[in-house]
Amino acid sequence: MILNGPGISYTEPDIGSEFVPPLPEHPREAIVKLCEHCTNRLLHRDELLGYEYWSFAEAATDEQAEVLCKMKMRRPYTLPEMVKLTGMPEAQIEKMLDDMSYTGLLEYNWENPERAKQWVLPMLVPGSAEFLNMRVSQLEEHPVYAKFFEQASKGPLSKATPMVPPGGAGIGMHVIPVEKAIDAASTSVPIEHIEHWLDKYDGKYAASTCSCRASRRVMGEGCADDPADWCIAVGDMADYVVETDRGHYVTRDEVYDILRQAEDNGFVHQITNIDGENKIFAICNCNVNVCYALRTSQLFNTPNLSRSAYVAKVEKDKCVACGRCVEVCPAGAAKLGQKLCSKKAGGQVPEYPRQELPDATKWDHTKWSPNYRNDNRIETHESGTAPCKTACPAHVAVQGYLKLAAQGRYDEALALIKRENPLPAICGRVCNRRCEDACTRGRVDAAVAIDEVKKFIAQRDLDAATRYVPPVVTPTRAGGFDQKIAIIGAGPAGLSCAFYLAEKGYKPVVFEKNERPGGMLTYGIPSFKLQKDVIEAEVEIIRLMGAEFRYGVEVGRDVTLDELRAQGFKAFYVAIGCQGGRLAGIPGEDAEDVTVAVDFLREVNSGKVDALLGRTIVVGGGNVAIDVARNACRLGSEHVEMFCLESEAQMPASEEERREAVEDGAHISCGWGPKEIHLDECGRVCGITFKRCTRVFDDEGRFASEYDESDLRRVDADRVVMSIGQSIVWGDLLAGSKVELGRGQGALADPQTYQTAEPDIFVGGDVYTGPSFAIDAIAAGHEAAVSIHRFVQPGSTLTIGRNQRRYTALDRDDVVLESYDNASREVAHVDREREKAAPFSEYIETFTEEQVRAETARCLGCGASIVDPNKCIGCGLCTTKCAFDAIHLDRDRPECSTMVKYEQKLPSLGKYALKRAIKIKFGKK
């Protein structure tokens, strides 16, 4: 053998190399021979690789290696046969065999007529490379085993994968569909059913550590799953697993519970595929982000190595592009596309590209997908999908919940919304409705009243009898995670983060310096827009999910981050928002009657202001300024006027907000900037002078205001409220930390993970983006929860295999809109009598059920899921997520259920390779 051979480059990141020392100048001869004997390469390679050498060197003594070299791979040996083979005394060889079995170099079974124990030198994968990784304590002591398993499950296949026929040729693992996805398949055969295998090995099951999860975690590419108990050994393998401290026996009901939880988490069922159609020894529940078996098909783009006999198919008439099937598809076969016809496609629904396959094509590394774990999580075709889902910062499945609402399935609609937005009742009142701005129906007449429908659905959360409390879906068999996580700030970002961490099985603790949750939702948004009991109701659900709230605690003042670390907190999500205001830097602004908008709104929302006398001048033109003006009007101020730099067309406040302010009695003057505040002899505000603003932005759209100082306007005032920006009040929160601050004192962080320069501190919401909308903060909180979950789980990557959140809207100018109903947009009733009687109560009523039915019928149904059959591996997970019965498995590839023994792999490969070569030569497909 060539020493220090370089191996093969697979264009994947080289992980675990730090665990592989250089080969010694004089390697142990017995170990070198063992490497030659056991490395089990499909294609000859004569290099001695470091991870192979050191794994065997750490696992075996020279004497053990010599015994192993005498054993033929996969041939069983009874104890008398081993005595004869080695010439060793029975007691001595039996102890050695048991020691090697405990390490993982050997396995054993009783598969003979006499039920005598027999030992087997297994192949590496599935086999000894896995066994070496299945006992966590052993793996942590010998991390080189992780690298060995990672490479042994990849390197030998690199050149053979294009020649693997349907069924897998006795190599590795085989996808077995979700049982209920094929219940009705009359053409199915027994080996395609999990129940068949559970019946075959009835009463002999053991749950064990997932070697793939454990291996990846040791090398820093874990998926944040708890590795324990996801793999189910069956038959004699169950005894082996238990007796060698790799697992524990489980009942059939416990097996069902593991399978159900795996499906809830989106894990793929696989069975071993090296013993033909009459034997398996394990059912695995695999996460594609770490699974080496699924990697064989995904990395090399050779699905024959994984797929079942089934292919997922979408009924487009039923599909509403909710994206649930797309999110769970391990192969990236399902992606969101469009249902509407396209002008570019000749008035037809567009055709979508299919993955090229090696069946009739020359195949080398240029055809591989080394970034498959991320690429498979891009959920939209480049040509786009429903604009509403794309435009929403949280990417809520708008089309899906509209359809559920249309069918009267309100609980399911609420559950679907909460997959991306845990505060739908709040957003139904205060969202800035970017989904409606993007709605294709707006090209016909008026956008669908999406937010009003959401508000109707989310009203269920305000009643304990109908509210939706999501179940915990956690990737651990322990019932949940015990890592302590602190969320600092109970605004929309913090609440969102708490919700999704609780849903994942954590018990996050939310620290809030105020006495009530909600942040600016509570202390900034007027109660006539958002009643505070709505906030309390949605927070109560998060509390019921397991989150703890500690009010009146300011982190940095009452308790420091280091003190929280000493209490056992492993990660922090800082989402304190922009709680301070900004002044204009003009004379007179330090007077008592000059305040900033956030302080004014906090006082009003805290109930500390009963009435406002005199004239109120508001400086600013955004939605917050509108809120100030409307509050002032409702508090009785005799004259309320807003002054802003922008023209009416440039005003940040929406047209609807401006209209409502005017209806409340506010006046709006555009094109003016503050110059000076005038005070009377007592030092109280008596007026303010403005100067004409001639330009707000430069040619590149950057703020660069210019003024005509000769064009002045003085107005009387009894108070001035500055609403020209907000600031972050850090206090001592970050004292001693490595968190870096940028423009506007906002925290700097990774744009995908929200991790700061202090690894255990994550940020989100306004402290990261600057002042924005609630839905932006909600989206950020969700992503932070993903990152924090990964961060606190040992050895996990924050980035690999996570949803890329890359959505593209279809081209609305390209869609064919020739036939549609002429129903006008429904409008929520405004109760003016209630508004007069209680000006600080909500007065815009919720849609009626009839209005919801009428409005949801206006949705054009832009999107649909598209399945690429060339990528589909037939796992059936998609069918478990669809609420519309729109996706099913069809048994289109019965040949993929051809299971052969490993010993028959070469004839299987050769036969298929010949057919493939002929196709390539003659250009057949």
Describe each model-derived feature in a short phrase.
Residues 457-478, 504, 537-557, 581-635, ...:
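Glycine-rich dinucleotide-binding loop and its adjacent helix/turn
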Residues 101-112, 334-335, 887:
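A short, conserved structural fragment
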Residues 33-35, 56-57, 196-199, 203-320, ...:
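Ferredoxin-type iron-sulfur electron-transfer modules and their immediate structural context
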Residues 74-86:
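Short acidic, hydrophobic short linear motifs in intrinsically disordered regions
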Residues 86-102:
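Short amphipathic alpha-helical interaction segments
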Residues 115-154:
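Short, amphipathic alpha-helical interaction segments positioned at domain boundaries
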Residues 396-399, 405-406, 447-451, 487-555, ...:
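Beta1-alpha1 glycine-rich phosphate/pyrophosphate-binding loop at the start
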Residues 533-582, 595-612, 634-744:
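A Rossmann-like FAD-binding core segment of flavoenzymes
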